[in-house]
């Protein structure tokens, strides 16, 4: 396990980590802090300690400190206790099925909607807490783009436009390159607004187009 997982599984280290996070937030006059735990191996074993850690932070923080989290969208069990400690829950509604050899849409509109409903209906989080995640990147299985992608086939939206042309802006895939174009991003935002969810978050802004006409 990583150092963070080791710390939250040790009561003494967990207490010290909580104290340091609160102290850091105060010292630098931050609005709050975010938990983004992505060590998914042995989830069922480590999640109880993560829940205790979240509760400890919640009890230790000042009332005006924001406490947020980034969570896996739907395939890990957070239960119904997790949501109570957070002001906002940011759903990482992307990367679904992306780390395989099979070309796939990693962030479909349908999955986005299912993720939001899952956290509201199954995890009991209020809509006013739930934030839908939007990817400003995609994945490509095209041999011709292997020099443009990263180690896991990821490619920025700006890179997609650079290599596939500006017409890609209004599509969700070209060949074996999958991403979210402008219409899908707009439709996701529309669903958020019309159904009274908290809002959207972006991963991440620097991956956007460099031309205002296509961002």
For each feature predicted by the language model, list its residue ranges.
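Substrate-binding cleft of extracellular glycoside hydrolase catalytic domains
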Residues: 1-41
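Glycan-binding loop/region signatures in secreted carbohydrate-active enzymes
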Residues: 127-193, 211, 215
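Short, acidic/polar
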Residues: 10-27, 72-81, 179-193
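Receiver (REC) domain switch/active-site residues of two-component response regulators
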Residues: 31, 87, 198
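Second-shell loop/turn segments in exported
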Residues: 3-11, 38-45, 101-106, 174-178, ...
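Conserved, mostly hydrophobic/aromatic
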Residues: 35, 89, 132, 192, ...
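Substrate-binding surface in catalytic domains of secreted glycosidases
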Residues: 19, 38-161
């Amino acid at each position: 396990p990583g150092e963070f997982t080791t710390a939250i599984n040790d009561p003494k280290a967990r207490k010290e980590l909580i104290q340091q996070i609160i102290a850091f937030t105060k010292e630098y006059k931050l609005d709050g802090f975010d938990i983004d735990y992505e060590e998914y191996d042995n989830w069922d074993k480590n999640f109880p300690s993560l829940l205790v850690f979240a509760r400890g932070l919640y009890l230790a923080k000042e009332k005006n400190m924001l406490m947020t989290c980034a969570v896996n969208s739907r395939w890990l069990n957070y239960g119904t206790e997790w949501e109570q400690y957070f002001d906002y829950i940011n759903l990482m509604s992307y990367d679904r099925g992306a780390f395989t050899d099979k070309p796939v849409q990693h962030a479909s509109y349908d999955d986005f909607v299912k993720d939001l409903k899952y956290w509201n209906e199954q995890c009991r989080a209020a809509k006013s807490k739930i934030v839908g995640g939007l990817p400003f990147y995609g994945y490509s299985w095209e041999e011709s783009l292997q020099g443009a992608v990263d180690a896991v086939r990821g490619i920025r939206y700006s890179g997609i436009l650079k290599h596939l042309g500006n017409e890609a802006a209004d599509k969700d895939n070209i060949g074996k390159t999958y991403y979210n174009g402008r219409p899908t991003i707009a439709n996701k935002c529309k669903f958020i607004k019309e159904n009274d969810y908290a809002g959207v978050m972006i991963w991440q802004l620097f991956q956007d187009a460099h031309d205002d006409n296509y961002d």
